[in-house]
Amino acid sequence: MQFFAVALFATSALAAVCPTGLFSNPLCCATNVLDLIGVDCKTPTIAVDTGAIFQAHCASKGSKPLCCVAPVADQALLCQKAIGTF
């Protein structure tokens, strides 16, 4: 039973800040219009393993951490809030 509990916490610690699938691209976006459209988005320059790291990294650049569909010309058409961020 103890192994299961430890394995469960280890797995959740390794969880990504963005879900797999459509919204799998972590981006730092200057603006999030209607909580749906990311504007002036940039790829993080460090590994963003946790929501707190992702949030701090984007905030240092004046941006918001978002999980988006593949961006085109620095514009992400569909974005959602990253896991573990506020």
Swiss-Prot record:
Q: What are the annotated disulfide bridges?
A: 18-67, 28-58, 29-41, 68-79
Q: What induces it?
A: By C and N starvation, and by light.
**Which Gene Ontology cellular component terms are annotated?**
extracellular region; spore wall
One Pfam family from the UniProt entry? Hydrophobin_2
- Show which residues constitute the signal peptide: 1-15
UniProt entry keywords in alphabetical sequence: Cell wall, Conidiation, Disulfide bond, Secreted, Signal, Sporulation
What does gene deletion cause?
Leads to wettable and fluffy colonies. Results in thinner hyphae and impairs the formation of aerial hyphae.
Where does this one sit in the cell?
A: Secreted; Spore wall; Secreted, Cell wall
The answer to whether keyword Cell inner membrane applies is no
Q: What does this protein do?
A: Aerial growth, conidiation, and dispersal of filamentous fungi in the environment rely upon a capability of their secreting small amphipathic proteins called hydrophobins (HPBs) with low sequence identity. Class I can self-assemble into an outermost layer of rodlet bundles on aerial cell surfaces, conferring cellular hydrophobicity that supports fungal growth, development and dispersal; whereas Class II form highly ordered films at water-air interfaces through intermolecular interactions but contribute nothing to the rodlet structure.
State the family named in the UniProt similarity comment for this chain.
Answer: Belongs to the cerato-ulmin hydrophobin family.
Give the PANTHER family listed for this entry.
HYDROPHOBIN
According to the record's subunit comment, the protein's assembly and interactions are: Homodimer. Homodimers further self-assemble to form highly ordered films at water-air interfaces through intermolecular interactions.
Q: Tell me what this protein is called.
A: Class II hydrophobin 2
